[in-house]
């Protein structure tokens, strides 16, 4: 997004989206998306990948936007690996209020994980519904 486009969006009272009007800490960018460290990080290196086009749902991204986001996820992982050396990752998207979406502009979380950051990591993203998190193999 050019600085001219950013300024136009800042002046547009009909588009109050913080990802459109005031992206902070941008680390990587491509034609269709950018990445930045999460302002409310849950672990060291927690980042988000955000499409430049304002769209609320991951399921409404174009195929090209999905590819652009996935490319940045991989690039951002390399940056996080070099700086923080995590032991694993969770990648996730909240879509809709029932899933906890609070900003209605798609953003894909890249959450580095570290040995011992939780007592029992089994189930990973399944912990979004705590009673269903643990399972037997």
Regions found by a protein language model. Give the residues of each.
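HIT superfamily nucleotide-processing domains
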Residues: 1-137
């Amino acid at each position: 997004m050019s600085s001219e486009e950013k300024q136009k969006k800042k002046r547009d009272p009909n588009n109050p989206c913080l990802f459109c009007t005031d992206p902070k800490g941008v680390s990587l960018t491509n034609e269709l998306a950018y990445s930045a460290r999460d302002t409310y990080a849950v672990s060291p290196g927690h980042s988000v990948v955000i499409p430049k086009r304002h769209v609320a749902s991951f399921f409404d991204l174009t195929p090209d936007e999905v590819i652009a986001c996935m490319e940045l996820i991989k690039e951002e992982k390399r940056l996080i690996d070099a700086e923080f050396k995590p032991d694993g990752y969770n990648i996730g998207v909240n879509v809709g209020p029932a899933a906890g979406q609070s900003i209605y502009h798609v953003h894909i979380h890249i959450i580095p994980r570290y040995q011992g950051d939780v007592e029992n990591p089994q189930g990973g993203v399944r912990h979004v519904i705590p009673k269903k998190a643990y399972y037997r193999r």
